[in-house]
Swiss-Prot record:
EC number: 3.1.11.6
Protein role: Bidirectionally degrades single-stranded DNA into large acid-insoluble oligonucleotides, which are then degraded further into small acid-soluble oligonucleotides.
GO biological process: DNA catabolic process
Subunit structure: Heterooligomer composed of large and small subunits.
Entry protein name: Exodeoxyribonuclease 7 small subunit
Similarity annotation: Belongs to the XseB family.
Cysteines paired by S-S bonds: none
Keywords: Cytoplasm, Exonuclease, Hydrolase, Nuclease
Subcellular location(s) per record: Cytoplasm
Catalytic activity entry: Exonucleolytic cleavage in either 5'- to 3'- or 3'- to 5'-direction to yield nucleoside 5'-phosphates
Species classification: Bacteria, Pseudomonadati, Pseudomonadota, Betaproteobacteria, Rhodocyclales
The species this protein was found in: Azoarcus sp. (strain BH72)
GO cellular component: cytosol; exodeoxyribonuclease VII complex
């Protein structure tokens, strides 16, 4: 029986692993069993990412007094960015 996969260490790590899983599955080189295992891992990673984003949104709402405010980012002529 395969050992359960560990939780990702960060949102970025989860996204990177998801990208790897997508590439592996799109290659068509996986057995059905391996493809199903990777799909299952991907579903878990997706859930982790959604929960992380939801938590970040809740923290932003608290910082903005309960109202979600659109953040506009302007790009300067030199390519740098600033919040407007």
């Amino acid at each position: 029986m395969p050992k359960p996969a560990s939780s990702p260490t960060s949102f970025e790590a989860a996204v990177a692993e998801l990208e790897t899983i997508v590439q592996q599955m799109e290659s068509g080189q996986l057995s059905l069993e391996d493809a199903l295992a990777r799909y299952q891992r991907g579903v878990g990673l997706l859930k982790f990412c959604q929960e992380t984003l939801s938590g970040a949104e809740q923290r932003i709402r608290q910082l903005e007094g309960g109202e979600l405010v659109e953040l506009r980012i302007d790009t300067n002529a030199d390519g740098s960015q600033e919040c407007a």
